[in-house]
Amino acid sequence: MPSILADLTAEYLSSIEPPADDLLEEMEAHANRDSIPIASREVATLQRILAIATNADRALEFGTAIGYSTIQVARTGCEVVTTEVDADRIAAAREYADRDNVADRIEIHERPALEALDDVDGPFDLVFLDAVKTEYPEYLERSLPMLRTGGVVVVDNALWDGEVPAAHATGDPADEATEAFLEFNANFVDHPALEAVVTPIDDGTGIGVKRE
């Protein structure tokens, strides 16, 4: 989704952004060509930075797509356990991971995220929510017990292309995802197990740190 920041701000930030390497640019073009939702360059960079900052050994990702953010976190040396239901996207993710020499650090569960959790064990240092938007509350509650104290949760699309603040102002959510995010965001920033915030990074990015 496009950035929700004002045009001049978004253009400036884009102008100082380091260029992506050839593989990531190829993945971005693939996602754009086939309308595959992947994390933005900014959010994937944020994930990579957080993996480094927390010295993450293991990450849990809801929504592999073609592995764009998965690979960037794996590049830090972190093992990534990730979920995806689309076989073609999984095949692409595996091919890209092989080419990037990080396939041995990526474990893809080919099934719905909530089902995959039945076979996933913690602990994790980083959790990334980017699959079915209406399922975010369940992703959060089921992954938190597996997240170590001081571990980080990253939530993608938290402002849903500006629809969430618009719905907050009008009281009229545009769709089911918007309605779900209104409730999720309020609960996320007030969650007793987290120190959390929702930021305007890209399409809205939630960041939470697990308390003791």
Annotated model-derived regions:
Residues 1-21:
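N-terminal auxiliary segments of SAM/dcSAM-dependent transferases
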